[in-house]
Amino acid sequence: MTSVDSQPDLSAAEAVLGAHVRDVMDFPKPGVVFKDITPLLSTPAAFGVVVGALADLARGLGATTIAGIEARGFLLAAPVADRVGAGIVPIRKQGKLPGRTRSEAYALEYGTAVLEIHEDAVPTGERVLIVDDVLATGGTAAAAHTLLRGCGADVVGLAVLMELTFLSGRDRTGTLDVTSIMKI
């Protein structure tokens, strides 16, 4: 489990994030409220604050690799990895990676999907932080965790911008330590 000492103060990042996320109703399906981070991405200073908070978390956890979940997780994982001098591992939707892969099916808030990772994505014992934009039902995070552990990674946590607490996604992440900048 994550120690209190390794947790950065996320209050500044939470305030910035709250001011730079917009709700899109009925996307991608009726009844779903999509959390659009485009305003965050298009505001360099705001994006920098959020990336900085995630990088501080990664450093505190001793992460040597950052795993980004397709697609918006890629937008966060790459600059975090750059800031901490870590490698990056893409966790992709089915059929998007060449070569030998591991696959894991999971349920979404609005359907089902499959994630994949290269079989040799991380060396055994590599300290990996998973980064994504939203923790909703927890299916994506749980699948990513399973894939990384299957490669032999030491998954040190999951960091997300937003956690939709009403969907109880944290309950599906098992022993995975979850850090969310903002809870909704």
Curated annotation (Swiss-Prot):
One of its GO terms (molecular function) is adenine phosphoribosyltransferase activity. InterPro entries: Ade_phspho_trans (IPR005764), PRibTrfase_dom (IPR000836), PRTase-like (IPR029057), UPRTase/APRTase (IPR050054). GO terms for biological process: adenine salvage; AMP salvage; purine ribonucleoside salvage. It is an enzyme of class 2 (transferase). Homodimer. Catalyzes a salvage reaction resulting in the formation of AMP, that is energically less costly than de novo synthesis. This is Adenine phosphoribosyltransferase. It comes from Parafrankia sp. (strain EAN1pec). The lineage of its organism: Bacteria, Bacillati, Actinomycetota, Actinomycetes, Frankiales. The gene is apt.
